[in-house]
Amino acid sequence: MLIDLKNIARRKQGKEIIKNISWRINEGEKWMLYGLNGAGKTTLLNILNAYEPNTSGELTLFGMQPGKIGYSADEVRNQIGFVSSSLMERFKDGEIVRDVVISGIFKSIGIFKEVEAHHVEMARHYLAQMGMSEFESQYYGYLSTGERQKVLIARALMGNPKLLILDEPASGLDFIAREDLLDALEQLYQRQPELSVIYVTHFVEEITKDIQKGFLLKDGTCYKQGEIKSVLDSDTLSDFFNRRVSVLHQNERYSLFLKR
């Protein structure tokens, strides 16, 4: 077990942003986290990343509990690879792609420590895994959004994380770029079956066959969680959206339609 949340809540300025959330993530599990804007996803991710405390409930992150002996927020973050659109914007256009990836070993924006030969080899290894070897010496600013996402995923893998959190990685990508990214992720999942993943999205079309579990977040609480087929179900999502929708599962992918 990597993550165990028991009835956690987070209150800000007198308002509960998330409440009564219980969620357990085991080694090797690939999860979808799905919720509309304002559902509390950002707050939940901040708690998982040890950037925000829970105000009630019991939280265990990689065997450690906040406030207990042995807990270290830095150690929690060392176990997590996190990729988000806000992270993408923090790197300068003039940085070399290889250096962006290497910075992941130091958990820094930019490199401020001595780079060793094995760091360079690691960066090349993960760039190759993401299909980005040819871009190693290029400027980060020359890359497309999809290419930058692959670079940031390679960067996240530099720390050998137990949990990879992908916060809307396909946001803003066209169809081809999205499918290229999802193909690269599928290959990653196959190569590292022990890696746990939380894939955050607004679109069921991004859910690939290796993501076998789903968590629906609505109004700050868990609406439903479990096996992906039971979560991405027409009746379940119709209730979730309070609109009549239909889910099509074909060729190991999902599509969502509004019934009219």
Segments from the language model and where they lie:
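Conserved ABC ATPase signature
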Residues: 139-143
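Catalytic Walker B motif of ABC-type/P-loop ATPase nucleotide-binding domains
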Residues: 164-168
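Conserved ABC transporter NBD signature motif
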Residues: 57-68
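Conserved structural motif at the start of ABC-family nucleotide-binding domains
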Residues: 3, 18-20
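Conserved ABC ATPase "signature" region
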Residues: 117-135
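Helix-to-loop junction immediately C-terminal to a conserved catalytic motif
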Residues: 49
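H-loop (His-switch) and adjacent beta-strand-loop-beta switch element
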Residues: 212-227
